């Protein structure tokens, strides 16, 4: 792609959640037109886009209709549940799919990306197996051993994951994974439980005409398979950072294209173990809204458009903490914002989701401090001050 790209470009976002919303804001700051597409109305990114459409992204006919209507220059998937074979058709017709149609197809399913990393590229991963029935899951779990981790091969933001400590918990894990599976899949992956010191996300920026570059690693903590807090810098050794960068480059080079990739690793005392990869901004990377001179959404946009990224500057110890709903609500209302913002170097992002349900991520608190622990405490404290209720 030429570095002399002309603006504005017409960008179609498939999936319009909170990550998409921040991407739209970044895109519009450079004057681009954005069409936000999702399966429900008034999704976060739709609230700031130029145009929006509600479709089933698993429907080839629906995808064809919106692409024909808008004729985008770029198609940018933000979620996993998309009819990915249709993206290849669009790419063949000259539309740029980010990072590529083939890469999107690989990364929409945990089984494909795991096989690429482990079997084709020889990268160390947790031991794993697959199951498409409860009986198969019981057998594979016995083979992998306990504890293990059960996940849908396709899900959104870590939904459907559970740690299985004993054979008696396998059926519950199966039901939870299938209930939270996205798309057509009824397949789960079973992974060896890694006794890690820290989980990290390495935001990896693959460019059309320039070398791959990296953000400072981001540490994160999960519950129920979903991120609860993240922090930067992660506080791991330089040799492990270099090893993670080498692995991330190897995988993203195999996938091709351009854009930001969220590459997740388990860091143990002695090893750097590849976990997962998302070919888009990562939820744990929301900390970059406060921690970097260019956040992950701006970096994604620049990489997509072939614009230069001369410097990524980490601005000091920073953290994010999620703001979760605790009950089912229509038109949720937020209080405690003033209290949350009373501390210095704290910011709040409310995503504008039209409804709430237990554990739904409704916003994020961001904080900077003199060290990472203080930043984490400040972000968590700010998030705890925000209450969500009905009107």
Swiss-Prot record:
EC number(s) from the headed UniProt entry: 6.3.1.21
Name of protein: Formate-dependent phosphoribosylglycinamide formyltransferase
Organism of provenance: Trichormus variabilis (strain ATCC 29413 / PCC 7937)
Domain (ATP-grasp): residue spans on this chain: 115-305
Family the entry assigns: Belongs to the PurK/PurT family.
Gene Ontology biological process terms, A to Z: 'de novo' IMP biosynthetic process
Any single Gene Ontology cellular-component annotation: cytosol
Disulfide bonds: none
Pathway assignment: Purine metabolism; IMP biosynthesis via de novo pathway; N(2)-formyl-N(1)-(5-phospho-D-ribosyl)glycinamide from N(1)-(5-phospho-D-ribosyl)glycinamide (formate route): step 1/1
Residues engaged in binding N(1)-(5-phospho-beta-D-ribosyl)glycinamide: 18-19, 78, 283, 353, 360-361
